[in-house]
C-alpha cells in the first residue's frame, strides 16, 4: 500500500514551512506511523551529509530526526547551493553534478530534476506510511511556475491535501493568503485544504473576525494560529540571521560569530545558542569586533570571496590583532581555510584562478579542486579527555596540508587532518561540522574560556546535543499542536 501524502506550502519564504513539516512528522511518528519528510528541491547553504555520503538540506535532516529516522538522500533529491553571481552548485541525488546560472537551470536540469523527484517519491511511497512534503518560497510565483519543481507540481502529482502557512509577524497576512490562493490554478487551489497562521503575537481573540472573514471568503478552513515561538529548530537559510536576536542577559561568556556574506552551515552554532551561560552574537564584517571571549569563523560557500570581504572591511586586521592579544578563534571548514597561510584555486572554481593570501594564523595551505568531500566522521579527541567518539561530517571543496614548522601545534583528533590547535589553546581549526554538538567536547572548550575569566568549570559529562534536540522537538510539537487541528485534513489523505 502506497504512503499517504500531506503537503505544506507557504505564502512567502520564512513563513514557517520547515517548522510545521517537522512538527507534523513528529506528531504522526508519535502515533506509531512510519513517516518521512520530503522536499523535491531545496535552495540552502545549510546542508547535512547522510551516512552514504550524500548531501541534503539540513531542514530535511531535522525533519527526519523529528520523524525518528535517519536522514537519506531521497528526502531531498535536489539541493541548490548559491555561490554568488547568480550561480548555484547543483546537487542531484546527493552528489554534485555541476554549476548553473539561474537563467540556464530550467534548460539544463528541469527534466533530470523532475525524474529524480518522482523516483525518490516512488521509493519513499513503498517504505513509509506517510510522506510529509514541504514546498519552497511561494507556490504562486507566476513568472516561475513553469519551472517550479517543489510546490504544487509535487502536490498535484501526489494528489496531496495541502496546508498553506502564512507569517503574520511581517504584516499583510490576509492579503498574502488571499493573493496566493487567487494566483493558483483552480485544480491547485482545490488541493489547499487548510490555512495556518504562524508567528502571532498578542491576544488571539483579536483575530477572530479576520479569521471568520478569511474562511468565508476563501472557503478554506483555518486549522490554527501558532503563537510566536523562540527558535527551537535550525533555520534553513541565512535570512534568519538578519532577524534581531535578543542578547542573553547575564551570560558568563560572549562568543561572536562572523556573519560572512555567504555563510554556510551556521547550524554548527545551535549548540552554543542552547548553552544558558553563553551569549552568541552574529556580527557583520564591517562592524567593530570588540573583545569577545571567542570568535568563530564559520563555514562559507565561497571561501575566497568571503576572505576578500574580511580584508575590504578591515575585519581581517581586527582578527589578527585579536589573535595577537591572546584572543580565541575557532575556524570551521571554510573558516579554518581562511585562518591558514594561503588558498589556491588553480581551476578558478570560485572565480579567477590564482593563490590568495590567508589570515596567516595557522600553518595550513588549502588547494581547491573539483572533488568535493562529503562524508560522516567518527573519531577520537586527542586534545580533550572525551571518552565518547567525536561525531561530525565534512563538506568541503578543497584539501588542506600542514605547512612549515608545526612545533607548538597539536592535532585535535585521532584523524589529524580534521583539526589543529596551538599550544596556547587559542587558535582552533577543524573540518568537522557538528563538532560542537558533542557535549563533552563543547563543555571542555567552553571551560577553557571560562578559566580565563576565573569562572568555575561546567560539568562535562553531558549527552550529545542530539538528545537535547529530541527534547526540544517534543516540546515544540506539544506547543504547536495545542494550537492546531490537523485531524480533519489528515482524514482527507
UniProtKB/Swiss-Prot annotation:
**Active site positions:** 333, 433
Q: Which InterPro entries match?
A: Class_I_gatase-like, CobQ/CobB/MinD/ParA_Nub-bd_dom, CobQ_GATase1, CobQ_N, CobQ_synth, GATase_3, P-loop_NTPase
UniProt-listed CDD domains: CobQ_N, GATase1_CobQ
Q: In which pathway does it act?
A: Cofactor biosynthesis; adenosylcobalamin biosynthesis
Write out the transmembrane intervals: none
Q: Which Pfam families match?
A: CbiA (PF01656), GATase_3 (PF07685)
Q: Molecular function terms in GO for this entry?
A: ABC-type vitamin B12 transporter activity; catalytic activity
Q: Which GO terms describe its biological process?
A: cobalamin biosynthetic process
According to the entry, every stretch annotated as the GATase cobBQ-type domain falls at 252-441
Keywords on record: Cobalamin biosynthesis, Glutamine amidotransferase
Kindly give the HAMAP family that the UniProt entry links to this protein: CobQ
Tell me the function of this protein.
Catalyzes amidations at positions B, D, E, and G on adenosylcobyrinic A,C-diamide. NH(2) groups are provided by glutamine, and one molecule of ATP is hydrogenolyzed for each amidation.
Member of which family? Belongs to the CobB/CobQ family. CobQ subfamily.
The name under which this protein is listed is Cobyric acid synthase
What organism is this sequence from?
A: Thermosynechococcus vestitus (strain NIES-2133 / IAM M-273 / BP-1)
Organism classification: Bacteria, Bacillati, Cyanobacteriota, Cyanophyceae, Acaryochloridales
Amino acid at each position: 500500500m502506497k504512503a499517504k501524502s500531506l503537503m505544506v506550502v507557504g505564502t512567502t519564504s520564512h513563513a514557517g514551512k520547515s517548522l510545521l513539516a517537522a512538527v507534523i512528522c513528529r506528531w504522526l511518528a508519535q502515533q506509531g506511523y512510519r513517516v518521512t519528510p520530503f522536499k523535491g528541491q531545496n535552495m540552502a547553504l545549510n546542508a547535512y551529509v547522510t551516512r552514504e555520503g550524500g548531501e541534503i538540506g539540513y531542514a530535511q535532516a531535522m525533519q527526519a530526526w523529528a520523524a525518528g529516522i535517519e536522514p537519506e538522500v531521497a528526502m531531498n533529491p535536489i539541493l541548490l547551493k548559491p555561490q554568488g553571481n547568480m550561480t548555484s552548485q547543483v546537487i542531484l541525488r546527493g552528489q554534485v553534478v555541476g554549476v548553473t546560472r539561474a537563467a540556464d537551470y530550467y534548460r539544463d536540469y528541469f527534466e533530470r530534476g523532475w525524474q529524480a523527484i518522482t523516483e525518490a517519491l516512488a521509493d519513499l511511497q513503498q517504505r513509509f506510511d506517510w510522506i510529509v512534503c514541504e514546498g519552497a518560497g511561494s507556490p504562486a510565483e507566476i513568472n516561475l511556475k513553469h519551472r517550479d519543481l517543489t510546490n504544487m507540481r509535487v502536490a498535484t502529482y501526489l494528489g496531496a491535501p495541502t496546508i498553506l502557512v502564512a507569517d503574520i509577524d511581517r504584516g499583510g497576512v490576509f492579503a498574502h493568503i488571499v493573493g496566493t490562493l487567487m494566483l493558483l490554478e483552480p485544480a491547485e487551489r482545490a488541493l489547499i485544504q487548510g490555512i495556518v497562521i504562524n508567528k502571532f503575537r498578542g491576544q488571539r481573540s483579536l483575530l477572530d473576525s479576520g479569521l471568520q472573514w478569511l474562511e468565508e471568503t476563501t472557503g478554506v478552513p483555518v486549522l490554527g494560529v501558532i503563537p510566536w515561538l523562540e527558535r527551537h529548530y535550525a533555520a534553513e537559510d541565512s535570512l534568519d540571521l538578519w532577524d534581531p536576536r535578543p542578547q542573553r542577559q547575564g551570560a558568563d561568556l560572549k562568543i561572536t560569530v562572523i556573519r560572512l556574506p555567504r555563510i554556510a552551515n551556521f547550524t554548527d552554532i545551535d549548540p552554543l545558542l542552547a548553552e544558558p551561560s553563553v551569549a552568541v552574537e552574529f556580527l557583520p564584517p564591517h562592524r567593530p569586533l570588540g573583545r569577545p571571549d571567542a570568535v568563530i569563523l564559520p563555514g562559507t560557500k565561497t571561501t575566497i570571496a568571503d576572505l576578500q570581504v574580511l580584508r575590504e572591511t578591515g575585519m581581517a586586521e581586527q582578527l589578527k590583532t585579536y589573535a595577537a592579544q591572546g584572543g580565541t578563534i575557532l575556524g570551521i571548514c571554510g573558516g579554518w581555510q581562511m585562518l591558514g597561510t594561503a588558498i589556491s584555486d588553480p581551476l578558478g572554481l570560485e572565480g579567477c584562478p590564482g593563490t590568495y593570501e590567508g589570515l596567516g594564523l595557522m600553518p595550513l595551505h588549502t588547494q581547491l579542486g573539483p572533488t568535493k568531500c562529503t562524508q560522516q566522521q567518527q573519531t577520537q579527541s586527542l586534545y580533550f579527555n572525551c571518552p565518547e567518539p567525536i561525531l561530525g561530517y565534512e563538506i568541503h571543496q578543497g584539501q588542506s596540508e600542514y605547512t612549515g614548522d608545526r612545533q607548538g601545534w597539536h592535532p585535535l583528533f585521532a584523524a589529524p587532518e580534521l583539526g589543529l590547535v596551538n599550544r596556547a589553546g587559542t587558535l582552533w581549526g577543524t573540518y568537522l561540522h557538528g563538532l560542537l554538538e558533542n557535549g563533552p567536547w563543547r563543555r571542555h572548550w567552553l571551560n577553557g574560556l571560562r578559566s580565563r575569566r576565573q569562572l568555575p568549570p561546567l560539568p562535562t559529562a553531558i549527552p550529545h546535543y542530539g538528545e537535547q534536540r529530541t527534547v526540544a522537538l517534543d516540546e515544540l510539537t506539544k506547543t504547536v499542536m495545542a494550537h492546531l487541528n490537523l485531524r480533519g485534513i489528515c482524514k482527507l489523505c
